[in-house]
Amino acid sequence: MSTKLQDHFDKITKILSGFGVEGCISYGEITFSIRDQRDIHLILKKLKKEYLFEQLTDVTAVDYLTYGQSDWQVGKVVSQTGFSRGRQQDFKTAAVDNRFEIIYQLLSMANNVRIRVKCKLKDAQIILVDSVSDLWPSANWAEREVYDMFGIYFNNHPDLRRVLTDYGFVGHPLRKDFPQTGYVEMRYDENLGRVVYEPVEIDDRVNTPRVIRN
């Protein structure tokens, strides 16, 4: 580990000492985890002001709904029975606390350091965090994309609309319980002279399963 990286880590840890934040250095990268999502805006504002993180390079999220679940149960019996291909997807779609994690990538050009700041969203019923578009204008569209793909709402965002999917789109495509086939398909109808939407007729099947070996 470089001494410069450790020095940056120690200084930032001191700045955030009054908050519920845990930090680590792993694979040459600094990561801080915020315990309370209500502190996100205040902490990021403090980092921008006191350690000159003038650039927000990305905002994204992760859905941990199926984390640790295997499509195929791998055991000794597999060698005798083989695998069952084309299995139907079976997601547990009930609200799960800590299901979503929001991630911010920050860059300080003045200090020549990048950090990752992330926070698990505790309440699965109210998926809401404060927007940081007032701190970094680049957050505007990035937060719109996170809302579009994951359904995470950003409080005080100036224009929280979908940015990638079509008008009237139902659902959020990067959620783990969103079917890979989608819900509707579109085609051009020559008789009507316009694009029409129809229910998907493709079976949602797992042909390339995720296997977790312990």
UniProtKB/Swiss-Prot annotation:
Return any one Pfam family short name.
Complex1_30kDa
**Presence of the UniProt keyword Protein biosynthesis in the record:** no
Q: What is its main location?
A: membrane
* Membrane topology of the entry: Peripheral membrane protein
From the UniProt record, list the reaction(s) this protein catalyses.
a quinone + NADH + 5 H(+)(in) = a quinol + NAD(+) + 4 H(+)(out)
Q: Which GO terms describe its cellular component?
A: plasma membrane
Give this protein's Gene Ontology molecular function annotations: NADH dehydrogenase (ubiquinone) activity; NADH:ubiquinone reductase (non-electrogenic) activity; quinone binding
Any idea which UniProt keywords this protein has? Cell inner membrane, Cell membrane, Membrane, NAD, Quinone, Translocase, Transport, Ubiquinone
**What's the Enzyme Commission number for this chain?**
7.1.1.-
Q: What is the annotated localization of this protein?
A: Cell inner membrane
Q: EC class of this enzyme?
A: translocase
HAMAP family attached to this UniProt entry: NDH1_NuoC (MF_01357)
The task this protein performs is described as: NDH-1 shuttles electrons from NADH, via FMN and iron-sulfur (Fe-S) centers, to quinones in the respiratory chain. The immediate electron acceptor for the enzyme in this species is believed to be ubiquinone. Couples the redox reaction to proton translocation (for every two electrons transferred, four hydrogen ions are translocated across the cytoplasmic membrane), and thus conserves the redox energy in a proton gradient.
* Recorded family membership: Belongs to the complex I 30 kDa subunit family.
| Assembly and interaction partners | NDH-1 is composed of 14 different subunits. Subunits NuoB, C, D, E, F, and G constitute the peripheral sector of the complex.
What is the recorded name of this protein? NADH-quinone oxidoreductase subunit C
Task: State the species of origin.
Answer: Francisella tularensis subsp. mediasiatica (strain FSC147)
